[in-house]
Amino acid sequence: MSNPIHQNRRALGATEVVTQLSKLNGEQALGWRLIDGALEKTFEFKNFHATIGFVNVVAYIANAENHHPDLAVSYSRCTVRFNTHDVNGISVSDFFCASKVDALLA
């Protein structure tokens, strides 16, 4: 069964995005950013093994939520990028999944 947060998706307006981004980042200076119509954050790790472990858990979350980010992976970094293609913008689903990804490292 799909998560109810993903039902009736719509693109959020600019004010809603800014409000949600502020809530998501909290006190973090280098948290999620709005880049070219998507939520984006780069995570850093001590080595490739740790990076790939993170990628695998993000993949599990994405599959469970049926909401898949773009990932850019290098030796000690992974950039996660969420937007909702079917609404051509950022939706509540993006913020929901971004918060789940953040919780991995909390």
What is each stretch, according to the model?
Residues M1-A106:
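Charge-rich alpha-helical segments
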